[in-house]
Structures are given as C-alpha cells and as structure tokens.
Amino acid sequence: MNFIIATRRSKLAQVQTEIIIDLLNKKHDIECEKLLIETVGDKILEVSLDKIGGKGLFVKDIEVAMLEQRADAAVHSMKDVPYEMPKGFEIIAIPEREDVRDAFISLDNIKFKDLREGAKIGTSSRRRAAQLKLLRSDLDIVPIRGNVQTRIEKIKKENLDGIILAVAGLKRVNLDHLITDYFDTKEMVPAIGQGALGIEVMEEHPKKELFKDLDHYNSKICVLAERAFMRELDGDCHSTIGAYASIKDNIMHIIGIFERKNKIIKKEITGTKDQYEKLGIALAEHILKD
C-alpha cells in the first residue's frame, strides 16, 4: 500500500511529515511519499499574517490537493489549523505532543532577564508580542516572518537582540542548542495546539482508520480543549489568544489568555479530563465575563 502525504515545503514541515511517515511505517508497514505544496502563507512573507486576512493560510492549498485526490492525507502543525474544519475533512489523529513552550534565542547568549532597556525582539506573533510587553514594557517588538532558519539569520541581519520561536520546531530541526532561555507556560502562554501535529484526512477516505493508531489520547484532548476555548472566542491569527491544557492524574488544567477591550486577560480552570471540551468553553466564558 502506498500513501501520499501532503505538506508544506519548509524544512520543518517536511521533518514533521517524516515523523508521521516513520510512525505509519512502524505501525502498518505502509510506504509513503510526500507531496510538497507552497501555501498562501508561505508565499507572502513581507506582510504579517494578521494583515493578510482569512483563516487557514497554511492549510487551504493542502486541502485542495486532497479534494483533487492528489494526496491521501496531510500533516499540519495544529497551531495552523482553524477551529472550524471544512465540510468533509477531519483531524483523524494527533500523535504525542512535543514541548509546548516558547524559546528565546539571543545574539550573544544574553539571557532574557539581562536584556538591555529597549532591546529589539523579533516576532510576528501578536500573542508573543503582547506577553513580551507584559514581561518587559520597554521592549521594541520587530515583526519578522520566514522559516526557522531564516528567522534565526535575521537576528544578525536586522540587528536584533533576540527572537522568540517555538521549542518544538527548534527540536525537530535540531536547532534547540541555540536556545538561550525557555519561557514558562504561565509567563508565555503557548499558541493553541503548539507542539502538536495533526493528521488531516477526508471523512470518506477508505483507509483513514489506519491513521487512528497514531493518536495519543491525552495529547488529543488537550489540543481539543484549547481549540474549544479558541472556538468560543472566535480566535484566529488576527487574535491575541493562547491556551495550554495539561493533564495530571486525570485532572486537566487549562491556562488561557485573550485580548479584550485592549486588555490582556489571563484565566485558569481545572476539572476532570473527560470534560475537556466543556472546560475549554468554560474558560472562554470566564474571560468574556471579565
């Protein structure tokens, strides 16, 4: 049996797809090949994502490939997947999640706490920018786009003091040795689904059940809880929004942030993990009442 897996062209996207292909090979001895696709989000690099407009900038072109039967499935970073799935598509599996934290990479290995006043920090994420300002209101936030390696190179090219990137992506492309600092998930709440990969298929695909074996239950329900939080707040790449769900002894804890009326609101909630979706919704409701 041969599967074609669609993914973005970036090195990180290809590495992430190789992770899924390796898991499939181990479980089912299935031969897979990658179909590389350049998405709208990949093509427009000079403009920040929130100004391009629309949802699913890194996903839609890949879904077209599945609709046209050029691919059997797709691998996404779950943080790129809109909470509303198009009709006929589903996330069939979410394997075990990687490190969810954000990392700081500086030019001369200077710790975040030791940055000079007015230091220039590169990020195009509204979520990261807002939380950086809460930690250090003096920081100068500089928008940067591009793949992981491109952003790292921009530290020198654009005379930045440092940049913020996801730990998971750095680990997957073996660049985590460059990390200067790790942000705690309470001081820098991650993006919805950060560190998690999702396998998307068409609901009618005859072999879709083969992917279900790759599902990691606790990782999946944590991501689904975060996505319920995002859905209730109608969040997307235009929003300053983040959430992180974790599980200990069947108890789920979720921390979430959202910008409302020009104010960053941060709330937490705890409950039994079988109520994961209700917890995400309840956390959003707490924020809306603030």
UniProtKB/Swiss-Prot annotation:
Keyword Oxidoreductase: no
Upper taxonomic lineage: Bacteria, Bacillati, Bacillota, Clostridia, Eubacteriales
Transferase as UniProt keyword: yes
EC number: 2.5.1.61
Organism from which the protein derives: Clostridium botulinum (strain 657 / Type Ba4)
PANTHER family: PORPHOBILINOGEN DEAMINASE
Highest taxon, organism lineage: Bacteria
Requisite cofactors: dipyrromethane
NCBIfam families per UniProt: hemC
UniProt cross-references to InterPro entries, sorted A to Z: HemC (IPR000860), Porphobilin_deaminase_N (IPR022417), Porphobilinogen_deaminase_C (IPR022418), Porphobilinogen_deaminase_C_sf (IPR036803)
The family this protein is said to belong to: Belongs to the HMBS family.
UniProt signal peptide: none
Cofactor comment: Binds 1 dipyrromethane group covalently.
BP-aspect Gene Ontology terms: protoporphyrinogen IX biosynthetic process
Subunit structure: Monomer.
Extra remark beyond the main annotation: The porphobilinogen subunits are added to the dipyrromethane group.
Name of the protein this chain belongs to: Porphobilinogen deaminase
Disulfide bonds: none
Alphabetized UniProt keyword annotations: Porphyrin biosynthesis, Transferase
